[in-house]
């Protein structure tokens, strides 16, 4: 090597080592996450954005459903009470309820103290007149003989107008759990139930894990003989999913590394060459993680799991180089021959991965950036570093023994052209008959939660009566008071819809926390003490109630007339306060993306069209309320982003086509490269559909990657040298690179995380077909 060459080699090594050091420095300061909301769209419509926020941080996302089973009902009830007592004193939980009265005391005291500001009855006509009071007393007399008579007898002297009962009726509507020994039980009586809500958001997995650990500790301290605890909820699923992602990333990467290493040893029979083969992979992975961390502020665990794919594709470059070094040649001369094709293959792969880079899903955008940076760095290390480190005189001599047999088999692939045409045409005809690929945009199909866990969650929800919202009204406003007033405007039309049978009921933050304007109106409607006393005296005539029995009532109304108005800050820590926090949301950002929203979950919706019509008539044009059908809107959201991904995929394919035309300047040669890729995508789609897989946006991403990785095979087949030795080594290198690719992506397909499994399985099948079809269609 001449001095100039040695200087360039040393410079390449220095730049490489400094780059690795910089990457390690950045990675050491980069946070890692497993928040699956990264695989929700980043910029949907305003209504869909609210849906995404609720999936991440809504009140339901903070809910933990707990069951204690095993043993007698008495023992289970005792454990439930001990657990609830311990958790109510835990700062990590905003509310804990197991059906005991103790858990409802703060809410009951709040409703009683502020009943005249909370009850809509305060502003009804004649409510505090002699006529209205007489009607209320007559109703009280009838209620005293009902099953609720004991409660009425206790509160009657202070609440003859029935404000507390009115509010309780207002909150009724959801299903209630069974009760035994004063605590909640499942329908079959075999499981005591608790409902805990964490202060931490559902997406804060670290905090969710700590809260769940505290819950386990409370059970351990309270449990009786033979008892066990089961737990479910979004926070539980998030924690288990993160553990699954972390486990898959390490497990799959380790297995892929071992299998590819065995393949390298079989082919090169040199531990040193084995180490060198993994340098492009390791360098690309470190660079990809560092750049993603700098660009996104954090690296998702799924991005690390996806790093296993670089073991397949990144090691391809080393295989192409090492395998094609013939005896008597060297790495530099071989690279001069390979580099134009290898460089074009890298560029086509980058075009394919760009479909991920511009995705509206932050998680997919991370995968795209990681892959593009990783492949470019892996190719650069192969080009500039490996020739310096590779021993002079190296040649993969085992290729000489393997190549003749492999070449004979490959040359016979041309006999498969007719079956190839039949299969491809049949696949195309089938897809045309179906009207296109059978895409599924069902959000539930992407859930990483195992079926048994989903079934347990469903059982606990049914037994405990936990909310499982399907329809939700979103009422936006510039500020919190505006949102409460918007919710109040919807009360009358929703009540009429309930009476018409369009829905069974609804919840509203204004039921718990009326707007300040409404509170002022109710306070102004309360009569002065002397006027109320005179009206009560007339209304009480002819009733069995003695004089002076309602003095507490007169006192409480007078106190309410001058009492401070209720704000969220003055509400005590309770389930009602948590309900307000879950239904009155301050949104981040400014303009249309900021402000506040009131959420009104609906129950038993029968006529969505009637509800939408009522909303249009009851809300102002500037900030109209919207009805969200959670499942429908979630599926529509994924459908719209799948269509966006389709356009990005087509853009990537067009970019590859333009790149090939600019490089080859021959329509025939471009066709020779693209034909096997198009056929591989077509047949892979059909095989996935016939296997019963639900094709999602992530399968579409996988198909775009089939083009990205398969283009290397078709390019090398199209440009293979006419010299027999070079052709043999080219085909052997393609075969072993494809095996490495199939190992990496095939293992990814076994992941329990739908994002990884969908992409891995699609690319594994498509990559193998790309090589097979390239061999079948190659010109001789």
Q: What kind of feature is each model-predicted range?
A:
Residues 1-34, 387-388, 392-442, 775:
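Signature of alpha-helical transmembrane segments and their immediate interfacial
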Residues 24-26, 38, 81-192, 207, ...:
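Alpha-helical transmembrane helix bundles of large polytopic membrane transport and channel proteins
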Residues 26-71, 172-183, 320, 412, ...:
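Solvent-exposed, non-transmembrane loop/terminal regulatory segments of multi-pass membrane proteins
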Residues 149-266, 270-271, 558-657:
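Extracytoplasmic
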Residues 274-320, 669-716, 746:
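Hydrophobic transmembrane alpha-helices and their membrane-interface caps
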Residues 278, 329-359, 722-751:
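Pore- and gate-forming transmembrane helices of large, multi-pass membrane proteins
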Residues 294, 310-325, 339, 343-358, ...:
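Transmembrane alpha-helices and their membrane-interface boundaries in multi-pass membrane transporters
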Residues 417-540:
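Juxtamembrane segments of multi-pass membrane proteins
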